[in-house]
Every structure is written in C-alpha cells, then in structure tokens.
C-alpha cells in the first residue's frame, strides 16, 4: 500500500470512528496509567481507559523546584489523547524533577479521540488550563511540549491569546506548523468530483482541526503571517524524514533567531521512527530534555 493509499485508509477509518461522537468539550483526566513503550501499546490501554493520565502527570499538588521552575504542559496530536501520546515521555520528565501536566482538550468528554475541534477554540481551552497550572503551582511560566497539532496549536495561544508572556519554551515533535498535504492525499481528494464538499462538509464537521491543518488553509495563513515566533519564547522542533502525516516533513520547521530545528536522522541515520510514534523515540525524548534543560544537554545517537 502506497503512502497516499495509507493516508486515505487512515482518514476514512478515523472519520468513520469519530463521526458518532462529534460534540467537542474539555475532557477530564483520571488516575495515571502505566508507562508504555510505544503508541501502539498506549492506544490499546487507552481504549479501555480513555481518560487515564500519563504516568507522573496531573498532580496539582506538585511544586516546581529551583532546578526546574517551570511546569511542563504536554499537548497531544489530532485524534490522540493525553495518555496514548505521552505515556512514555511524561514519566521521564517527572523523574527528571518536573511538574508535568497533560490535559485532554478538543474532543468529546471522556472520549478516546481528542484534539479534533476548532483549533482557536481549543487554544483558548489550553490557555485556561495553563492558567490553572500556574495558579496551582505558583509558577510564573510553563514550558510546552506538543506533538503534531499539539506542537502547532500552542503557537495560536502564544500569538493571539496572550500566551507568550506565560511560556518559556515550546517544543514541537513533528508539529504541523505549516500544514500538510498528506503525501498528496489532500489534493487528490479535493480534485475528485465532490471531493471539496467531502473534505469541508464531512471531514470538517467531524474534525475541524483536520481541515485547518491543510497546507494553505486560512487558519494557517493567519497563524503564520508576520513570522513564526513570538519574542521571549524559545522554540525547538524535532522532525523525522519518515513522517507520513506532516508532509513534507520540512513543513514542521520554524524560522527565527530563537528556533532550533532538529531531524532525527541527523542523530541516527537509520532511525525509521515516523509521525505517530515520535513521542516514544529515544532520540526525540532526549532532544526534548535538552530543550527544557539546555545546561545539562547531551547529544543522543542510535544507541543512547
């Protein structure tokens, strides 16, 4: 099955699955689930525990330390949830000494699939959650680590909702910063008779965020106009050459003096990690840790 066919199959599956649960709300988090080695095992667990918190996260009694004064807020990708995206990284950051938080936003309350709603609306919910974290922890700023849409959506919060004053670092893992053509699927679908109506009417109704992440969408044009970054915020992007969702993979990259762009294969040429599993890749995880704590950064490779 070629990349376009794989993308089309995935789109049909996700659309068919989500169409029965279209109301968008801020989903609650429950007790922490176990650590997981991959998105596959995490998703299997999340089927029965869709509101599980990633290990070590969502402890509102946590107080930041002098070594790690900014809490870390994790932001998941389209159709994922906090647990299945972050059941690996969350525990790592907690053991490093961070206060870690991971909300479920932009999906049906208690549902498996989150981050499908209108992105500006979800960004507003995200901002409210950041305020909750700041109030609980006493911190003045947070750091954000996001995957896919979750690495791009906070930029709306930073640019339009006052978030730049409350964020120190934004790390994006395969973020959809400049959109995706889904290996040509977007153009292929829209070129079909009725394809535009299907994309905007059916997919857009079930998953507004999906349409908003198309290359050239009005949402992304607005987000990226006037530059990619905000003053006072440090940005790190980790992309993978084998990304099959954010395509071309270079559309993840940002430009600006406070940006550091990475590619997994520059650290391990044979790293085949793709879009979905990048949050579990050991190189990506270390690059996140480096971005959050540059004073103790070290260079990962194929083995470490």
Which residue stretches match the model-derived regions?
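Extracellular/periplasmic catalytic domains that process cell-envelope and extracellular macromolecules
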Residues: 64-68, 94-95, 136-137, 145-146, ...
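Serine-dependent carboxylesterase/thioesterase catalytic core
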Residues: 75-76, 100, 120-223
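Solvent-exposed loop/turn segments at secondary-structure junctions
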Residues: 77-81, 106-110, 147-152, 175-180, ...
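Active-site catalytic motif of lipid deacylating hydrolases and related acyltransferases
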Residues: 33-53, 58-141, 188, 192-201
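Conserved beta-strand scaffold positions in the cores of enzyme catalytic domains, especially
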Residues: 72, 100-102, 170, 235-237, ...
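C-terminal catalytic-base region of ester-bond hydrolases, centering on the histidine
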Residues: 192-193, 230-304
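Extracellular secreted precursors and ectodomains with disulfide-bonded cysteine-rich loops/domains
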Residues: 60, 205-208, 266, 300
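Secretory targeting and sorting signals
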Residues: 1-28
């Amino acid at each position: 099955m070629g990349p376009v066919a794989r993308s089309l199959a995935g789109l049909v599956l996700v659309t068919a699955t989500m169409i029965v649960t279209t109301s968008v709300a801020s989903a609650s988090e429950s007790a922490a689930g176990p650590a997981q080695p991959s998105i596959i095992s995490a998703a299997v667990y999340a089927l029965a525990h869709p509101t599980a918190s990633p290990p070590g996260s969502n402890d509102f009694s946590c107080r930041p330390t002098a070594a790690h004064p900014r809490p870390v807020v994790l932001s998941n990708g389209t159709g994922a949830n906090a647990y299945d995206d972050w059941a690996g990284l969350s525990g790592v950051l907690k053991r490093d000494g961070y206060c870690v938080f991971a909300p479920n936003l932009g999906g049906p309350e208690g549902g498996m699939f989150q981050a499908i709603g209108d992105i500006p609306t979800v960004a507003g919910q995200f901002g409210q959650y950041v305020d909750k974290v700041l109030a609980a922890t006493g911190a003045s700023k947070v750091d954000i680590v996001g995957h896919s849409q979750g690495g791009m959506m906070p930029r709306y919060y930073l640019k339009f909702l006052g978030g730049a004053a409350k964020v120190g670092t934004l790390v994006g893992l395969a973020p959809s910063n400049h959109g995706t053509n889904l290996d040509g699927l977007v153009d292929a679908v829209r070129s079909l008779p009725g394809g535009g109506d299907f994309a905007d009417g059916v997919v857009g109704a079930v998953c507004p965020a999906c349409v908003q992440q198309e290359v050239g969408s009005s949402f992304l044009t607005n987000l990226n106009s006037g530059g990619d970054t905000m003053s006072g915020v440090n940005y790190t992007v980790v992309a993978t050459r084998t990304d099959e969702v954010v395509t071309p993979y270079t559309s993840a990259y940002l430009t600006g003096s406070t940006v550091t762009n990475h590619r997994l294969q520059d650290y391990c040429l044979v790293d085949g990690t793709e879009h979905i599993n990048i949050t579990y890749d050991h190189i990506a995880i270390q690059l996140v840790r480096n971005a959050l704590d540059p004073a103790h950064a070290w260079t990962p490779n194929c083995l470490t």
